[in-house]
């Protein structure tokens, strides 16, 4: 409960940022929905994406944000790596300022904290598992780095 207020404030800032954004047809397309390292495989013909069960018509940066979030969690929110990921994406697709604002709003949301606490609330258990407690402690410990990453990546 000690961290709830700050996480809620961050979530509200994220939502406020995203609510300002329109679903501009120029920036939408088919998104994988769960684009991460587990859904990219190497074949004899090159790299391929698999598992499109969660695909959707949405902002293109949603897949980039999901991929970045997974990578950054595993690399302690390294700003240099985040910059490299955005630049690699930019080599393939132009990122307009409006899309960068969407990316900022998505990455600002404390998704992992929400995911863990939501899992607990919906499990209908009277106790939280030791595994979930450890996950929650890790997320809370990384929160300062995560927020610094978002601020530095977008020069805020």
What are these regions (language model features)?
Residues 5-12, 108-111, 141:
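Generic structural signal for well-ordered, non-transmembrane alpha-helical segments
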Residues 42-45:
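Activation-loop N-terminal segment of eukaryotic-like protein kinases
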Residues 1-30:
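ATP-dependent phospho-/nucleotidyl transfer catalytic cores
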Residues 47, 55-57:
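Activation segment
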Residues 29, 34, 39, 51:
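Conserved catalytic-loop position in the HRD/HxD motif
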Residues 61-94, 107-126:
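Active-site activation/catalytic loop segments of kinase-like enzymes and analogous catalytic loops
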């Amino acid at each position: 409960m000690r961290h709830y207020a700050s996480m809620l404030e961050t979530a509200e800032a994220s939502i406020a940022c995203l609510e300002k954004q329109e679903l501009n047809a120029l920036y939408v397309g088919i998104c994988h929905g769960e684009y991460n390292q587990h859904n990219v495989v190497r074949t004899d013909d090159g790299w391929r994406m698999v598992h499109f069960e969660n695909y959707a018509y949405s902002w293109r940066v949603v897949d980039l944000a999901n991929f970045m979030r997974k990578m950054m969690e595993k690399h302690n929110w390294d700003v240099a790596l985040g910059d490299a990921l955005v630049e690699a994406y930019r080599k393939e697709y132009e990122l307009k300022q409006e899309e960068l604002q969407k990316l900022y709003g998505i990455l600002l949301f404390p998704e992992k904290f929400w995911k863990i606490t939501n899992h607990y609330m919906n499990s209908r258990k009277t106790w939280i598992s030791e595994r979930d407690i450890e996950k929650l402690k890790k997320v809370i410990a990384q929160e300062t780095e995560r927020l610094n990453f978002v601020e530095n990546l977008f020069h805020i």
